[in-house]
Amino acid sequence: LQRSVFIGWDPREAAAFAVARSSLKRHLTQPIPVRGLVLDDLISSGLYTRPTTRKVNGEGRFEMVDILSIREDYDGRVATQHANARFLVPHIAKEGWALFCDGDVMFRGNVARLFDSLNPKYAVYCVKHKHEPSAGMKMDGQQQTRYARKNWSSFLVFNAQHEANRALTLDLVNTLPGRDLHRLCWLEDGQIGELGIEWNWLAGCSKPVDDPKVVHFTLGTPDMAGYERSAYSDEWRAQLNNWAA
């Protein structure tokens, strides 16, 4: 099966994206296309039509608001521009295995081996976190939100040709509240394959493991105030310096 990787892009997290992309390529043992998932491109191509607006947060910064996701206890603010755009990946990839990951990850393992291990009977693979974040703020002053299957969607391997993913139409992606998309509502439980925790290890949240293949700085990357000493922060900074050299 064809293989591809899509990394979420947000202009406020350019350094994080650089680390994610360069660390992924550094560990690859075979050529796999890697591209950024850029909201402006998806809007201009007509793929992304979800209504959005902007609000100013408590730090005076603009934040994107997903209007379809607003409810009585949630104002619709999303942490990144790719919050809901990720669900377009099977449509863009069209065939084979397509990995999406948030931009605040660092790869320490070979994604080619991950692809080799997958079973095509599953529509999607992810790490099935039992992660209940505490209320409050996370990276860049973003509000921490809670929803079913929190962080499952931060690292998804889509089987683009799977029959079940035909239900993930452009209309569905562009009309459902984000919380429904993030809980993988178009799939039955048995259609979701499980990856080991090492493929989406949450810094500051997950229990220690010997050798995480992907470190996810979900609370904040090491260049953000308060997260400079996160686990694997020195490795992250070294990767950033290598990219910039």
Language-model segments: residues:
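A short acidic (Asp/Glu
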Residues: 17-18, 46-47, 110-112, 137
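A short catalytic or substrate-binding loop motif that flags glycine-/basic-rich loops and adjacent residues
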Residues: 81-83, 147-150
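Alpha-helix N-cap/loop-to-helix initiation residues
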Residues: 13-14, 107
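GT-A fold catalytic core of metal-dependent nucleotide-sugar glycosyltransferases
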Residues: 84-132, 157
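Short, structured active-site "lid" loops
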Residues: 49-93
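Short beta-strand-to-loop element that shapes/binds the nucleotide-sugar donor at the catalytic cleft/hinge
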Residues: 124-147
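Short, acidic, metal-binding catalytic loop of nucleotide-sugar glycosyltransferases
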Residues: 23-31
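A glycosyltransferase accessory/donor-loop signature
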Residues: 1-12, 18-19, 29, 36-68, ...
